[in-house]
Amino acid sequence: MRNTIINRRFKYTDVNATSILIIINVVVFILQNIFTDLPYILSMVPVYIKLKHWYWQFFTYMFSHVDFWHLFSNMLGLFIFGRIVERSVGSREFLLYYLLTGTLAGITSYFLYLYSGSIFTVVLGASGALYAIMLLFSVLFPNAVVYVFGIIPMRAPILVILYFFIDFFGQFKADGTAHLVHLSGLLFGILYITVRMKINPLKQWGIMK
């Protein structure tokens, strides 16, 4: 069957987009600590999008972080999983996947927060896109073992499933974590992998035959 525009593959390139993304995130973090209003401009705040039409926040929220440890944990995850995924699928595919899943996770979360009345919620961080990257890593390397906290061995698919349940039940608690963004990142990651890459994650994980 001839490829459509949805699943047409890019020519393989490797320009280390992972490092570029990390650098951008670090630069933004430095700037937002110099210009104190910048986090509210870049973060996704539903009331600003609704009333001020700041639609760029659907994209920019994933480059803004609340503090150093938030930035460090996300960039560490991106460094660990991102480079391997990028080398496997190519830089262009990697960037499209990362930016698209992150943006769609932001848009979906916006409508869910709007529906729930949480319009003053401030959403920021690369976690939605990072969850999608972890998902793709687990699909490409289903037998890979990840050491949680550096000591607990766990197969990559098990880790992703564990994170899913943590965020699913975590959304019912007011703990300041954007669980909806995490879950949306996983959802759009699954759709991207299934529709564009024509890979069934459950088959890759050995759950389905």
Annotate the PLM regions:
Residues 1-209:
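A detector for small-residue-rich transmembrane helices and their helix-helix packing motifs
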